[in-house]
UniProtKB/Swiss-Prot annotation:
It comes from Nitrosococcus oceani (strain ATCC 19707 / BCRC 17464 / JCM 30415 / NCIMB 11848 / C-107). The gene is atpE. This is V-type ATP synthase subunit E. Keywords: ATP synthesis, Hydrogen ion transport, Ion transport, Transport. GO terms for biological process: proton motive force-driven plasma membrane ATP synthesis. The keyword Chaperone does not apply. It comes from the Bacteria. Belongs to the V-ATPase E subunit family. Produces ATP from ADP in the presence of a proton gradient across the membrane.
């Protein structure tokens, strides 16, 4: 082989090797490009998923806040309505007590029962009964008989000082240290919470969409 042929053979070999290297580098570059694009697409997909999830979570929070605000608003309206109804019923009951006090035949037996209950609650033998001006006029002359029918085992003296109330009686121990307020107003005040609860249970059913 001549020197010229050897050079050509070497050049051909070098060129072939260069082509193989170029193809290898090109293939690697193509793989790298594909991998970069794939990773970029994956990052983009994950980012989009996170953004979608974040948007959904935000929408859910906004929705829950709107629902809670609506429920609170409705609850407030119901509470006001309930309070108005409770007040109306309590006022009506107070009015009925005042009407009862004007009907002597119905009222005096009730007054005797209130007197008996008040006297029974005080462990004293000598008691004082305080009633309003109207009842003083009715009972001052017949008090001993009236009181004895209600409380047979104790001495209940009628106070000459009228009590400010619509009806009923306040029973006081002789030394003034113990008092049982069985006036209509006193009993209504003590029973207010029980009355409110009873009225709420009778007039209202909790709405199924609300909790708490």
């Amino acid at each position: 082989m001549t020197a010229e042929a050897s050079v050509e053979t070497l050049e051909a070999a070098l060129l072939a090797r260069a082509k193989r290297l170029a193809e290898e580098y090109l293939s690697r570059a193509q793989h790298s490009r594909d991998r970069i694009i794939e990773e970029a697409n994956e990052r983009l997909r994950l980012r989009e998923e996170r953004e979608i999830l974040a948007a959904k979570a935000m929408a859910e929070r906004v929705y829950r806040r709107q629902v809670q605000a609506s429920e609170l608003k409705l609850q407030g309206k119901l509470d006001r309505l309930r309070w108005e109804w409770v007040q109306a019923v309590v006022q009506n009951l107070s009015h009925q007590c005042k009407v009862l006090a004007t009907d002597k035949s119905r009222y005096l037996p009730v007054l005797q029962r209130l007197l008996a209950a008040g006297a029974a609650a005080i462990e004293r033998e000598e008691l004082i009964a305080e009633i309003n001006q109207q009842d003083l006029g009715r009972l001052q002359e017949t008090w001993k008989t009236f009181a004895a029918e209600a409380v047979s085992d104790k001495c209940v003296v009628l106070s000459s000082e009228p009590l400010t109330c619509s009806g009923g009686v306040r029973v006081v121990s002789k030394d003034g240290r113990i008092r049982v307020d069985n006036t209509f107003e006193g009993r209504l005040e003590r029973l207010a919470e029980e009355l409110h609860q009873s009225i709420m249970e009778r007039l209202f059913v909790p709405p199924s969409g609300l909790h708490g």
